[in-house]
């Protein structure tokens, strides 16, 4: 634990909190709530340290936590675990939950409604093995994820259809900015695939990947905010009369690519593209639901005893 905490301290030393806040505000066109952004930036290091202590393995350079860069960030400040950071975070948290005797996990269980009494949430109704189960609780937390499953092109799993949001709307729980939907610039283009799109991580561009049109010419700064890059790609696709543009990483060292982006390399290879030699066909796809159930700084919704966290909020 000591060595892991020290690694997180190294992260903190290299982090410029004020610049992080400004980058976030600028990318959000200053529509963000400053107080919320300040908390995000100031608590980020503590959260990373907690994850390291839980057992999250982050990539390192010279024994210290490594950083990459993504869109709208003015410096390298993104910590990562190979090219499957989200999966690593998820698995680390699941393992931590399994250790807690006060947490009971119900897998393959679907929430279909919450139970209310006098504008107070007192439980939920779930389906498991085709059986309806009523769970009563003093507090209910919605963490049902996003809405990507309703889009033809999305990097999300198909089962993410906004169920938590629908339940909140049914009970007149306040929502906010539900028209704010993030379109990721670079999902792997497959002509006849209506399933979940393979995300080509933004860090690929952060490590030097270049976006090219059909003439193999760059047409945008790859590290502008995602909405700006996506709009530029859509515009270029229309000009090229194509459903994709190219992402080129062939100028990068092949062994580095195979190591740093092992998952993307393997998945593209399965789909017939060797990223060390071939241009990657990419197109924008729905990625993240920016709006959701309105909450305060403690994740409390407009309904008593009901909270919301994560992408649904």
Predicted regions and their residues:
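Conserved redox-cofactor binding core of oxidoreductases
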Residues: 52-131, 143, 187-191, 211
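Glycine-rich active-site loop/strand segments that organize a redox cofactor
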Residues: 10-40
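Glycine-/small-residue-rich beta->alpha transition segments that form the dinucleotide
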Residues: 137-139, 143-148, 312-313
């Amino acid at each position: 634990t000591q060595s892991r905490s020290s690694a997180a301290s190294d992260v903190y030393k290299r982090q410029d909190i004020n610049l992080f806040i400004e980058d976030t505000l600028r990318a959000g066109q200053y529509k963000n709530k400053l107080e919320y952004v300040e908390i995000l930036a100031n608590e980020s290091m503590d959260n990373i340290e907690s994850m390291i202590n839980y057992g999250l393995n982050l990539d390192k350079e010279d024994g210290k936590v490594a950083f990459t860069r993504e869109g709208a960030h003015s410096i390298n400040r993104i910590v990562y675990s190979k090219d499957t950071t989200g999966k690593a975070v998820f698995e680390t948290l699941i393992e931590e939950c399994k250790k807690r005797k006060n947490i009971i996990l119900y897998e393959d269980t679907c929430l279909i409604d919450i139970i209310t009494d006098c504008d107070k949430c007192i439980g939920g109704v779930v389906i498991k093995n085709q059986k309806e189960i009523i769970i009563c609780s003093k507090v209910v937390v919605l963490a049902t994820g996003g809405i990507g499953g309703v889009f033809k092109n999305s990097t999300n799993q198909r089962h993410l259809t906004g169920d938590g949001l629908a339940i909140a709307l049914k009970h007149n729980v306040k929502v906010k900015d539900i028209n704010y939907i993030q379109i990721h610039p670079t999902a792997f283009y497959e002509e006849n695939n209506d399933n979940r799109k393979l995300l080509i991580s933004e860090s690929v561009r952060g490590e030097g990947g270049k976006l090219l049109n059909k003439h193999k010419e760059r047409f945008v700064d790859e590290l502008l905010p995602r909405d700006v890059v996506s709009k530029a790609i859509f515009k270029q696709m229309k000009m090229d009369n194509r459903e994709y543009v190219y992402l080129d990483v062939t100028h990068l060292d092949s062994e580095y690519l195979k190591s740093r982006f092992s998952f993307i390399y393997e998945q593209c290879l399965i789909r017939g593209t060797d990223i060390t030699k071939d241009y990657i066909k990419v197109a924008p796809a729905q990625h993240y639901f920016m709006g959701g159930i309105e909450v305060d700084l403690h994740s409390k919704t407009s309904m008593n005893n009901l909270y919301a966290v994560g992408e649904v909020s």
